Amino acid sequence: MAQFHYECVESKTDKDRSQYGKFIIEPLARGQGTTVGNALRRVLLSNLEGTAITSVRIAGVNHEFATIKGVREDVLEILLNMKEVVLKSYSEQPQIGRLRVEGPATVTADRFDVPSEVEVIDRSQYIATLSPGSILEMEFRIEKGTGYKAVDRTRDDVATLDFLQIDAIFMPVRKVNYTIEDAHIGSSLEQDRLIMDIWTNGSYTPQDALSNAAGILMSLFEPLKDITNMADIPSGETTDPTSQIPIEELQLSVRAYNCLKRAQINSVADLLDYSQEDLLEIKNFGQKSAEEVIEALQKRLGITLPQEKVAKAT
């Protein structure tokens, strides 16, 4: 199998610490340039984990359409500015950042007080302008995730604490382009040269982004290396196909889905280990959510969970 190599031929960092990198990957067999380029592009834009501010609590404010005395921006504008802040978290757990500024002042992300596990990438990001005597005091929730996360009005953990939610953009890669050229290797022209242009928000270098995307693709395809011909499986080892269905197929509400995920319930097979009583013991999982899961299993798959806990043999 022919080997290829890659090279970073151009890189730069802008004033806001966003970064750009240009990579050449060659030689690839004819047609593989498009295959590799498209797969990497999709993963770079959708699957890399990033960090974002997901909610904000501002002293004296209880809704996003309010104004703050002595602050030029209204609350909605402040939230939009907070949405643009670029962070990098080294912790898997949500973190809380704080800000308290007295006017007169121009407030930027440089004023943030964040945990040691969190790095502010662009400290010049503008937040608000304060007049003399005014005070802007807030707390904000920092989370890791992938893709785009819309406001979830059902989240009790933030709603009950007066946090105003923000549509979070976790994507660390802002843009990806790729082109295919002929690779002139020796006398053969039947090979591809893949050229990739990657722009990031600064929380990843383009090199790290490309490396992580390749790792995700490798882990995705790794199980396919061990595919066994179904004809070779002994008849006594058949598996109920419905048990392998992911819980996403049940089309549950966001609240019920998130509770199941936090409890490490990822498939119907995992759910079958629970009785109806067991569901109610899941953290933040109420009667309404339990009924929703029970109904979805019955209507979509014809599966009925036992009412009571099943005694396990010792």
UniProtKB/Swiss-Prot annotation:
Chain residue ranges for the region called Alpha C-terminal domain (alpha-CTD): 240-314
Record carries keyword Nucleotidyltransferase: yes
GO CC annotation: cytoplasm; DNA-directed RNA polymerase complex
Keyword Nucleotidyltransferase attributed: yes
Keywords: DNA-directed RNA polymerase, Nucleotidyltransferase, Transcription, Transferase
InterPro entries xref list: DNA-dir_RNA_pol_insert (IPR011262), DNA-dir_RNA_pol_RpoA/D/Rpb3 (IPR011263), DNA-dir_RpoA (IPR011773), RBP11-like (IPR036603), RNAP_asu_C (IPR011260), RNApol_insert_sf (IPR036643)
Positions of region (Alpha N-terminal domain (alpha-NTD)): 1-228
GO biological process: DNA-templated transcription
Pfam family, one: RNA_pol_L
Catalyzed chemical reaction(s): RNA(n) + a ribonucleoside 5'-triphosphate = RNA(n+1) + diphosphate
Name of the top EC class for this enzyme: transferase
MF-aspect GO terms: DNA binding; DNA-directed RNA polymerase activity; protein dimerization activity
EC number: 2.7.7.6
SMART domains the UniProt entry points to: RPOLD
Domain notes from UniProt: The N-terminal domain is essential for RNAP assembly and basal transcription, whereas the C-terminal domain is involved in interaction with transcriptional regulators and with upstream promoter elements.
NCBIfam families (UniProt xref): PRK05182.1-2, PRK05182.2-2, PRK05182.2-5, rpoA
Its biological purpose: DNA-dependent RNA polymerase catalyzes the transcription of DNA into RNA using the four ribonucleoside triphosphates as substrates.
Subunit structure: In cyanobacteria the RNAP catalytic core is composed of 2 alpha, 1 beta, 1 beta', 1 gamma and 1 omega subunit. When a sigma factor is associated with the core the holoenzyme is formed, which can initiate transcription.
Family, similarity comment: Belongs to the RNA polymerase alpha chain family.
Protein name: DNA-directed RNA polymerase subunit alpha
Organism in which the protein naturally occurs: Trichodesmium erythraeum (strain IMS101)
